[in-house]
Amino acid sequence: VRSSAASDVYKRQILGYDQHLVYEGRGPLEAASIGVELAPDDLAMRCNLVCLEGDLLKNHSCGRLETEEGDVLMRYLQEHLGSERVHFYTGVQYRHLLVIKGGNKHLLCTPPHDIPGKPWREYLPKAADEAAEDTARLILHLMEESRRLLAAHPLNLGRVAQGQDPANSIWPWGGGYRPMMTPLTQTFPQIKRGSVITAVDLIRGIGRYAGLRIIDVPGATGLWDTNYEGKAQAAIDALQTDDLVYVHVEASDEAGHDGNIPLKLDTIRSLDSRLLKPILEALDPEGTGCLQAAGEPVAVALLPDHPTPCHLRTHTNEPIPFAIYAPGIEPDSVLTFDEEAAREGAYGLLQGDEFIRTFMGITAPAAAQG
């Protein structure tokens, strides 16, 4: 599948959404995830808590803040910087939300996970046109004030004393307005009911706009210590009633951003043995090769969001491998799941909505693009 380096673009693309029609940045999606209703002129932005060290951006996630810590800091920022126009909302861990009423979305922003170890001042948000200059100035002011406030916060002083990275600045990016997304149940008649299982706000927001129910799994963290077994069981249970179940695991992406090869390998093994294997065994307890749930045949697809090579520590815009196991599919010659082997797969390179239409058993239009 042809992917985009932007997570929010690709995650919608695999569900069949045309990025040119529905793209509004990840901010509005994360707003939907945490239940923030946006007015038409509300600019919603992902708001990372990051660690700056001198002139460099040291860590886009502050060494993985606990959500409780992030909540303390976001409430503190809302108390001191919030206004009728500006509102800070708590998300998950280091991933939070900034909403600017009447904000202009035409900004040039760099995701902080793209610039670890780089001079942060070179990547500060800028206006893409004259109309957005007021919004850009406001964001720069909020960032400057956040550095002043967070540096002296007791929580950060405690983190420094314990040898942890302080969350000493906000970093807004991924801004946009409320998107117009048609529910999947209207696009695909086969889907009467669907669900999504994830710990990540972005995916939860996409799920809400796509008309999917959100399944919460205790112990799902969005990191390598997530509850793989719990996600597997939740998927097995959901397949008794739902026509589509979207299970997302963030662990390998985070390991890639950390540049940690052993950890990334471990997350892949855990995905295989602790998530995929239990699901397949539950759907085919006799080992017949025929997957079933609630007396109906089941198709399973496995694919990553996008590459996050450990040596680059950021996303790349490269085709990603995928595998589909479904009734009636003739196996091809590919025996391993990796980028090189997948190039020889029977499906070739799929683009746009061709993946979801292939998976759903629908012939993609000849002109489908993405």
Task: Go through each PLM region and give its residues.
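Internal helix-turn-beta structural module
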Residues: A299-T363
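Single conserved hydrophobic/aromatic residue that forms the stacking wall/gate
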Residues: V1-A6, Y10
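Long, charged alpha-helical interface segments
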Residues: H106-A199, I203, R208
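Anion-binding catalytic surfaces of enzymes that hydrolyze or transfer phosphate/sulfate esters
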Residues: P172, Y177-T267
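A contiguous, mid-domain pocket- or channel-lining segment that forms the substrate-recognition surface
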Residues: R26-A152
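Metal-dependent active-site segment of extracytoplasmic phospho-/sulfohydrolases and closely related
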Residues: T267-E318
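Active-site His/acidic residue clusters
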Residues: L52-L57, I100-Y123, A210, I236-L280
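Flexible, glycine/charged-enriched surface loops at secondary-structure junctions
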Residues: E84-G91, A152-A167, V217, L244-Y246, ...
